[in-house]
Amino acid sequence: MSCLGNCLLKEREPIMYNQEKIKKMKNHELAIEAYFYAYNHKLFGGASQKKAVKCYEQIIAIMDLDERMNLPFISTYGRCYVATEKRLIKCTKKLFGYKIEEQNWNEIKHIFYNNTSSRGALILDTVYGEVKIGVHRDGAGYACEVLRKLKEDAK
């Protein structure tokens, strides 16, 4: 069994799924759920459903057995992110395959967000410098709140 039983959307989990049903879901089904979670909570950006689902499948495949998907979101440039209790994982579609990048919570010093009339941005102050992630303006505040909570819990 892969990480399927533990890759849960912890907060705002869909009511129609119980624990046993989630444990039986395949990576593709979990990736679709992650995409629709991001879409329904205005955490989506410039990626098609097909591209986002493929990226989420790549992320789910590398997750540890004890990790859960706490916050899946998609940047305005089509990069897919998943925040877990341990780290922030980013997947980017390249010409030949996918590129996965990870940042542990101890590498991120501060998390901010900024909204304008047309777009939102998550700003991560990391040990490597400032990282800006363009997101939907309506979901930036919620995403920032969840990321801060995960960072605080990881201490």
Positions of PLM-derived features:
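Short, surface-exposed beta-strand/loop "edge" segments at domain boundaries and coil↔beta transitions
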Residues: Y39, L43-F44, Y81, I89-K90, ...
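Acidic, Ser/Thr- and proline-rich intrinsically disordered linker/docking segments
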Residues: Y17-Q19, K99-K155
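Phosphoinositide-binding peripheral membrane targeting modules
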Residues: P72-C80, E85-R119
